[in-house]
């Protein structure tokens, strides 16, 4: 292990880690919004939209992210829809993540007993108030373990961004290995930076689960 090489490559990995984190978080935020909308559509059994949401979830979950990225990056320009690599990466991650978030939120919503909705309605709440103040907070709390697992999964999936020439962590590692053959040092830095990104998310998720358990949610 050549520590001088590691010190030399460190700035490149820092830049790549920032790109990975920036695009990953952008895709995850969009995925959360898409997932919540799809979950609510399925929960309320909205005609037509429910079938569209179901078809989207099946398509997204049963095709690899790499294929989705290739379709967006190489396929869409053929029909006149052009975009850059960063937008493509965010869109691909959001498309994949939305389906996983939808299933996490849907399971949380469906775990709430119907009697809670009935009780809220009997107290004079309308459907919007019941969902906002009674159902959704509990469903979100119950969904925390699946939500955190999905966030970690999606951040790890950013490693395929290198396939569309985004200079993320994986691209940087492969590029440096190909140029200088410093395989051990490059892979060591790759592991360290992925741990620096993912370990805090995992620890935060565990802490949040414990807090919610003590507060009485998701028991």
Identify the meaning behind each predicted range.
Residues 1-219:
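Transmembrane alpha-helices and adjacent helix-loop boundaries
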């Amino acid at each position: 292990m050549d520590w001088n090489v590691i010190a030399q490559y460190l700035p490149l990995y820092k830049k790549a880690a920032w790109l990975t984190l920036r695009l990953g978080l952008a895709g995850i935020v969009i995925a959360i919004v898409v997932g919540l909308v799809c979950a609510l559509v399925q929960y309320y059994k909205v005609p037509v939209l429910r079938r569209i949401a179901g078809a989207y979830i099946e398509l997204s979950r049963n095709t690899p992210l790499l294929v989705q990225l290739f379709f967006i990056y190489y396929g869409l320009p053929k029909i006149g829809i052009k975009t850059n690599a960063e937008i493509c990466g965010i869109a691909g991650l959001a498309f994949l993540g939305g389906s996983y978030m939808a299933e996490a939120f849907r399971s949380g919503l469906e775990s709430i007993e119907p009697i809670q909705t009935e009780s809220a309605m009997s107290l004079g709440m309308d459907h919007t108030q019941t969902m906002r103040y009674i159902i959704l907070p509990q469903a979100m709390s119950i969904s925390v373990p699946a939500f955190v697992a999905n966030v970690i999964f999606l951040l790890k999936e950013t490693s395929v961004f290198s396939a569309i020439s985004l200079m993320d962590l994986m691209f940087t590692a492969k590029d440096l290995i190909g140029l200088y053959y410093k395989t051990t040092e490059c892979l060591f830095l790759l592991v360290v930076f992925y741990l620096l990104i993912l370990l805090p998310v995992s620890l935060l998720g565990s802490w949040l689960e414990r807090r919610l358990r003590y507060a009485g949610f998701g028991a």
